[in-house]
From Swiss-Prot:
Keyword entries, A-Z: Amino-acid biosynthesis, Cytoplasm, Diaminopimelate biosynthesis, Lyase, Lysine biosynthesis, Schiff base
Organism placement in taxonomy: Archaea, Methanobacteriati, Methanobacteriota, Stenosarchaea group, Methanomicrobia
Stored CDD domains: DHDPS
Family from the record: Belongs to the DapA family.
Signal peptide stretch: none
Catalyzed reaction equations: L-aspartate 4-semialdehyde + pyruvate = (2S,4S)-4-hydroxy-2,3,4,5-tetrahydrodipicolinate + H2O + H(+)
Residues of the active site: Y134, K163
Protein name: 4-hydroxy-tetrahydrodipicolinate synthase
UniProt site positions, description: Part of a proton relay during catalysis: S46, Y109
Known EC number: 4.3.3.7
Amino acid sequence: MFEGVIPALITPFNDDASQSLDIEGLRNCIEYVIRGGVHGLLACGSTGESATMTHAEHIRVIEETVSAASNRIPAIAGTGSNNTEEALLMTRAAKMSGADGVLLISPYYNKPNRSGLLKHYRKVADIGLPVIVYNIPGRTGQNLPADLIIEMVETIPNLVAVKEASGNLDQMMAIIQGTQDLDREYPFILTSGDDSLTLPVLSVGGHGCISVTANIEPKRLVEMYDLFRRSDVKAAMKKHYELMDLSKALFMEVNPVPVKRAAEIRGLINSGNVRLPLDSLGEQNTAILRGVLSRYD
């Protein structure tokens, strides 16, 4: 269900005093990536600035994403929290909104123990939506090791995928090895959470990416994925390296600061602003980003 190229959508904000949601801009971004051939949508992840949205805004963005997807491709909602009750609240809201699945970042800051993590994921999974575990230790302060992911997969039937952003290929291979022969209704999916590792992850048995770069160059990323799936590895590798400069530029500052400015430069949204405590991309880095983007026109 969640294989292929899935953009981690930005959440555009207006330039008014409250930085209100730019729903028209969100819809425009969604149509752009769908025209680019992506295989799904993720709303309200790290790239979508879920951390600085109210619950009402968070739910509105999920609803708008589900509506805009219009059953053409799956719509996934980021509903994770370091507070299990909040994760339950947002996951129930996602289910009510018609989301096809949820992405649950591992609880950050409070560093739960193993049994706490297992109980957290089981409790949220009991709501009934397909669950994608999100492992990003650089943001959460805690890695989810391969043996823990495998135990989750063995004991939570609707835990269907992991977004792996640890940067550790050995760990990813261990997850793939440990889950590929399990007796499940659907094969367990491992998707890359690092754009620079999408092709390497595919090459060791991964299934796609949840991508920042796909907000800006969905077509090229989908072409790379399709070439790999057709076993044209040399052509896929060429596409991969073509995208490297852009992928690096989109992380010249903390995500999603550069990608929102890139979307503004491309005319997808009116403003690339972000909410505090993040700050928008400055003039010098904006000029660098423009130069990189010009090579993809």
